[in-house]
Regions:
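Acidic (Asp/Glu) and glycine-rich low-complexity loops/linkers
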Residues: 1-45, 51-64, 75-80, 93-97, ...
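Short, surface-exposed interaction patches in beta-rich subdomains
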Residues: 70-168
Length: 168
């Protein structure tokens, strides 16, 4: 159950379960309805976009190497991992126990409506990360980007420029 596209393509998928969505090029993929499973990887290499309505996965991974965007309107999961290495953006909402959010390029991760118990956020590029952490937050900025967070985590570890990590 893998979707893959390399040319200008628009795919609307409504499946009870998927393992991977892999876009190379400018394809657009819309995941309609509720899709459930254990592991789901969303991968964009190029300018394509992925939009998902409702994902219920134990482990959700989202990767962008290019200018494409990923928009997840609602996720329920244990682990959410996102890495942006290009100029694309990730917008993700929902709940997770643990989230690892990384920006290595100029793209942004907007996850301030993703309620996660523990969050690790790292910016080594010029992009920005915003998110919500309820218990533990580890934030590191080594590039020119910024990290903003919501919530009131009891454990807060910050590394980077003094003004680069702030509460929203």
């Amino acid at each position: 159950k893998i979707l893959s596209g390399e040319r200008r393509l628009k795919v609307i998928a409504s499946s009870p379960s998927l393992d991977e969505v892999d876009i190379k090029g400018s394809a657009d993929v819309y995941l309609k309805g509720t899709i459930k499973g254990v592991d789901l990887t969303l991968n964009i290499t190029g300018s394509g976009d992925i939009e998902a309505e409702n994902l219920q996965y134990t482990n959700l991974s989202a990767y962008i190497k290019g200018s494409g965007d990923i928009d997840v309107k609602n996720v329920k999961g244990t682990t959410v991992k996102t890495i942006v290495s290009g100029s694309g953006d990730v917008n993700i909402k929902g709940t997770a126990k643990w989230a690892a959010l990384t920006v290595n390029g100029s793209g942004d991760i907007s996850a301030d409506k993703l309620a996660a118990t523990e969050v690790i956020a790292t910016v080594s590029g010029s992009g920005d990360i915003s998110w919500y952490a309820s218990k533990q937050l580890d934030a590191k900025v080594s590039g020119s980007g910024d990290i903003e967070y919501k919530g009131n985590p009891s454990i807060l570890n910050k590394q980077g420029r003094k003004d680069s990590i702030s509460r929203k």
